[in-house]
């Protein structure tokens, strides 16, 4: 946030018009992208929340799927969770960056939430949308991170059981307070922690992905498969990739696909 500058919100009418144009062109899925979508609308002349914007987009004929990212845990509202619960179009996937499971490190990062708030939020989301896929971002080796802090992160990973996680080794970023902090962590310690985290994340991801094998689910076909011309590639509502036999005329269509085999990060259908 120090480097990216202040949030700015596009006018809702402008967004709706663009979505309507896309729908008229045959687009069935849209992605709403923002540094923090949950802060949307606060600086508009006529304030509108992100939850209200989603409700308006839901009304657009032709749009079958709505995705959004990124959601900052500090201001993901109960209203947004309620809209997700009642929506027929919002995809069953939420990217909810954790960064660290240690409340002490989160405070140093100026994240404005703590471990307890994050876990309570996950419980609320799962109660509202039980089949939602949760993904996250985690940084290992932030200045001052102790072994106890790292274990707090591992504890959150085990409790939340993410469908997948983007794991990063901390690197100094010019213009951020952390770049000049003392207590920079030795590289060998960071590497060892990163490897432990990655192993845990991958184990949980594989267990969760395997649970869908054998089910028939809706897949939006996105493209011809790059490796095998007899296959097309699509995506489940939960954002998982599926490869299946198909032809180019299927691109842009939503089809029911039986998931025959889980290959770790993708399915064969």
What annotation goes with each model-predicted range?
Residues 1-13:
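Canonical Radical SAM [4Fe-4S] cluster-binding loop centered on the CxxxCxxC motif
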Residues 13, 17-20:
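Ferredoxin-type iron-sulfur electron-transfer modules in oxidoreductases and energy-metabolism complexes
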Residues 15, 32, 68, 96, ...:
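Conserved, mostly hydrophobic/aromatic
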Residues 24-147, 158:
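Conserved SAM/AdoMet-binding glycine-rich loop
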Residues 41-62, 109-112, 172-203:
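Radical SAM enzyme [4Fe-4S]-AdoMet core and its adjacent flexible, acidic
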Residues 150-160:
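A glycine- and small/hydrophobic-rich beta-loop-beta segment
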Residues 164-171:
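Glycine-rich phosphate-binding active-site loops on the catalytic face of alpha/beta enzymes
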Residues 180-269:
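Terminal RNA-binding accessory module
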